[in-house]
């Protein structure tokens, strides 16, 4: 793909064939995330047809890290597991050539020791880094600060630094916002429009997206297919949010409807019908 900016939504012809692989292959996805987001993350993965295992029970990081089809590491998982657990899982994944996703939650919020751990993880070669504008800017070495886990930076500020990070580290950088920006290691840039503001009112929605990115990575045999695949799962997420918002009376009903919408979209697409 040339270094140009493209747009991709759920109706793009390249989207659904990628997503179908998750339902058909049902990949085993291992995740280290925080207890706040674990349930939603697991439900999102189950809804699209993946098989998740989440947590750092004895032996899991070293075992599942190398056995999974893909893995995601949510830095806020340090609430309930250790840096050693995360590094062990990442090293096991790298040794087995298992692709993994890093979500640098709250990077740049002013907690130096925490940020140092994230930088150590990032140096171990994730296939994808996914975060909000402030997190990506901070990881790229910028001066952006976050308000806890919330972004205080704009997408416009983050994209140039995210692109530099993607190119210098030869990985994909996904920046979530009112529209999502997927940045490739050779200067590629895919914009994913859509979604709904209620996603920002559901705890763990961004964290669960990291798991979904891992799920699609697990289905790919070629690294060159990753950029479009990452954009495709963001497009699925956006469309499911739009569907869920139609009948939602608030954040709680939206969260339930969102998981249902993911399942309907995936099942309908696999069966060749409309959701």
Give the label of every model feature segment.
Residues 161-166, 224-240, 258-259:
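Short, well-structured alpha-helical segments that form the helix of a local strand-helix-strand
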Residues 138, 203-235:
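Short, small-residue alpha-helix embedded
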Residues 1-54:
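Glycine-rich phosphate/adenosyl-contacting loop at the front of the ribokinase-like
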Residues 74, 82-131:
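Glycine/small-residue-rich loop that forms an oxyanion/phosphate-binding "nest" at active or ligand-binding sites
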Residues 10-14, 238-275:
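Charged C-terminal helix
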Residues 111-189:
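Conserved phosphate/ATP/ADP-binding segment of small-molecule kinases
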């Amino acid at each position: 793909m040339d270094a140009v900016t493209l747009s991709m939504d759920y109706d793009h012809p390249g989207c659904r064939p990628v997503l179908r692989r998750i339902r058909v292959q049902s990949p085993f996805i291992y995740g280290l995330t925080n207890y706040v987001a674990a349930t939603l993350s697991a439900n999102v993965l189950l809804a699209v047809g993946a098989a998740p295992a989440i947590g750092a029970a004895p032996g899991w990081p070293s075992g599942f890290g190398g056995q999974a089809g893909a893995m995601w590491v949510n830095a806020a998982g340090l609430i309930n597991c250790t840096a050693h657990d995360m590094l062990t899982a990442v090293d096991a994944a790298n040794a087995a050539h298992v692709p993994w996703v890093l979500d640098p939650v709250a990077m740049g919020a002013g907690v130096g020791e925490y940020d140092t751990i994230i930088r150590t993880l990032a140096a171990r070669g994730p296939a994808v880094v996914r975060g909000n504008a402030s997190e990506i800017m901070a990881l790229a070495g910028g001066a952006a600060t976050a308000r806890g886990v919330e972004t205080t930076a704009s997408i416009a500020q983050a994209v140039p630094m995210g692109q530099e990070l993607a190119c210098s580290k030869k990985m994909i950088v996904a920046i979530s916002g009112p529209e999502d920006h997927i940045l490739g290691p050779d200067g590629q840039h895919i914009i994913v429009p859509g979604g709904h503001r209620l996603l920002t009112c559901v705890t763990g929605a961004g964290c669960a997206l990291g798991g979904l990115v891992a799920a699609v990575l697990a289905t790919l045999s070629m690294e060159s297919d990753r950029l479009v695949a990452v954009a495709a799962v963001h497009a699925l997420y956006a469309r499911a949010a739009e569907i869920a918002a139609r009948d939602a009376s608030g954040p709680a009903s939206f969260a339930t409807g969102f998981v249902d919408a993911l399942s309907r979209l995936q099942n309908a697409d696999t069966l060749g019908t409309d959701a």
